[in-house]
Amino acid sequence: MSSRNLVSIAQAVRDEGGRALIVGGWVRDELLGRTPKDLDLEVFGLPADRLRPLLERFGRVETVGESFAVFKVIVDGDQDAIDVALPRRESKAGRGHKGFIVEGDPALSVEDAARRRDFTINAISRDPLTNEIVDPFDGRRDLQGRRLRVVDPRTFGDDSLRVLRGAQFAARFDLTATDETKALCRSIPLDDLPPERIWGEVEKLLLQAERPSIGLALALEIGVVDRLWPELRALVGCPQEPEWHPEGDVWVHTLMVVDQARARLDDLPRGPAAAMMLGALCHDLGKPETTAVIDGRIRSPGHEEAGVAPATRLLDRLNVQSLDGYDVRRAVLGLVAHHLKPSAFKKAATPVSDGAFRRLAQKVDLELLARFAKADCHGRTGTFDCSAMDWFLDRARALGVEHAAPAPLVMGRHLIELGVRPGPRMGELLKRVYDKQLDGEIRTVDEGLSAVKQMLESET
């Protein structure tokens, strides 16, 4: 919403005897010098039956929450809507995020309304008419000191999701939680959280923070990892060979890879970006099962394939499937199962064939794999040669398979024209001719049909 329309609404509220304040993340982001999103207004001193007609002067009004009076205002010519709400009075009536009785209360004071917020950095408001900052819980001071501090310890645990929100806020805004905040988060049960709400916070942590490792480290410290993600907890203390991983155990390496991956995905759509970050989180989940001392060195043979099962379990816990039509789960498991392939292909004793690239492209996006493998290579202390990933991607691009394997030239309809009936035999013939195509022996439909005819002749 334009600042002019915002001020006009605030003036109209004032003329009716109320006060409108910008609240929440918008004010926090402004104070941090970031571009704010999702403008929210809280209106004091006006009941809902007077507020709605006032808002209708400015555009279309949709009711989002009847019981606690939240209105979405869509003004003609404005790209974004604005949420306008009465201050809320909440009382806990049961477990979970739905176990609340919430009522709009226009008589609530600004301080009491801010008290229901989770952290002090989100309890700051601004008057759009005077630009006065209203900050009853010293959120600005905490922003300046990069502190994450709970507003009201007595009610913070009413919604256990706030524990995960704390981790993602720490990551996004580079905050350090106070000792009181950490102790409080450890004490709050998390078993009432549905996977969808957990994933919502994890996605923000992974995709919106420059250094997601900050939030993941806090999640470990406050017991989130232990209680929600045992697959990740198993990485803590899992040793690695110091020559290849001087940074420490698998957990430390994973945090470094997560940050490296985050630095390489700003040009990706949401689905592939989420797959890249989840791949970073999951890529070495097979190491706890496979790590052993072999010939005096710490090794993890087969950890790529061994990581698929725990990665699947973790994705199940988060209920991650597809995002915006992109199969995130398939992409993540492909990255886990094949994350060493770029380096292995480059170091192979004999040159890796074009067919090997084409076959690998059936299982995973090779551009995403190369991008991730580079993050994995750089996710260590020390200096390592990571040029194999560039070589790998150049080969994939030269073959035109960086995002997918080539489509089959010969289809079932072609075989029907040759008199082959649908069934297992047709499937076997299609597989054999496609294998030849992957190996570069077939480049056109005609060449493919000639190969099929030879196969049919050899059967007689």
Show where each model-derived region lies.
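Catalytic cores of the polymerase beta-like nucleotidyltransferase superfamily
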Residues: M1-T460
